[in-house]
Amino acid sequence: MGDIKAEIKGIGINIPERILTNFDLEKFLDTSDEWITTRTGIKERRIAEEWEKASDIALPAAKEAIENAGLTPKDIDAVIVATSTPDMTFPSTACFLADKLGSSKPMAFDISAACSGFIYGLTLANSFIKSGQFENILVVGAEVFSQIIDWNDRSTAVIFGDGAGAVVVSKSDGESDILSAVMKSDGSHWGSLYCPVGEKLRMRGRETFKLAIKSMETASKKALQKAGLTLEDIKLVIPHQANIRIINALAERMELPEERVYSNIHRYGNTSAASIPIAFYEAWKEGKIDKGDHILLTAFGGGLTWGAIVLKF
């Protein structure tokens, strides 16, 4: 059992077609493109159709990830969906997704860890694979934050977007592996970022900013230590795409050059649990990472939750 490795075998994303630019927001909010860009780095974000639910936007991403892995939905043993915008309170979005995929009755459940949800899910998939319980697990981050945004609140309406990203984590006897994971939470800071049932998202931006940088830096260093690696061994750091100021501050604290920290927040805004798989996919497509590279993923989110993963792609 100790020789089992867990590799990311396939990746897929789904980005809604509708684009909402900063100039569009100027038409109904007391804001401007300059104000938004300077404070967040965001130029535009994608918005799902009103009828679309998390499982709907997750489906194309999941299909692409499974196809890229050279598998079929019938090969998937478990489906884990990280989302803060589930289809329903229950059943889980993962159950809806598994059914839409035509999977063979896999274990299916959701994770509610806000923007940290995807790396929480990846950590669980890693453990399930290495325990020998499963061989192929679909991990998805899918969000339709446009449905829980107060569009009159410029502090949050300018930040969030919709999207989905998915990976297939599979048993492997090759070199690829999830090497280490550090996952944490602190419920005493719940008021920094939260969404009451049936209401809209609320955020204390300044408090969130400070907590985000410190938590991601600490988790990243611990994950590297557990993996027996240093930052010099890491090809690319892929942080949660929350705010360009947070990303830049993290890079500065970790003494990393800009080219080794991936960012696509200008195109999509903050897509919460979907941000890391979307960024991972685009970095791969752009040739910034390749098989055999060491990658560091790190995120923070409401809860507060945070964590980091080191993997060999």
Swiss-Prot record:
UniProt-listed Gene3D superfamilies: 3.40.47.10
GO cellular component assignments: cytoplasm
Associated pathway: Lipid metabolism; fatty acid biosynthesis
Sorted UniProt keywords: Acyltransferase, Cytoplasm, Fatty acid biosynthesis, Fatty acid metabolism, Lipid biosynthesis, Lipid metabolism, Multifunctional enzyme, Transferase
Residues annotated as the enzyme's active site: C115, H240, N270
Enzyme class: transferase
Gene Ontology process terms (BP): fatty acid biosynthetic process; secondary metabolite biosynthetic process
Localization in the cell: Cytoplasm
GO molecular function, one term: beta-ketoacyl-acyl-carrier-protein synthase III activity
One Pfam family, short name: ACP_syn_III_C
Catalytic activity, reaction form: malonyl-[ACP] + acetyl-CoA + H(+) = 3-oxobutanoyl-[ACP] + CO2 + CoA
ACP-binding: annotated segments: 241-245
Top-level taxon: Bacteria
EC identifiers of the protein: 2.3.1.180
Domain notes: The last Arg residue of the ACP-binding site is essential for the weak association between ACP/AcpP and FabH.
Family: Belongs to the thiolase-like superfamily. FabH family.
Complex and partners: Homodimer.
Function: Catalyzes the condensation reaction of fatty acid synthesis by the addition to an acyl acceptor of two carbons from malonyl-ACP. Catalyzes the first condensation reaction which initiates fatty acid synthesis and may therefore play a role in governing the total rate of fatty acid production. Possesses both acetoacetyl-ACP synthase and acetyl transacylase activities. Its substrate specificity determines the biosynthesis of branched-chain and/or straight-chain of fatty acids.
Protein name in the entry: Beta-ketoacyl-[acyl-carrier-protein] synthase III
Lineage: Bacteria, Pseudomonadati, Aquificota, Aquificia, Aquificales
Gene this chain is encoded by: fabH
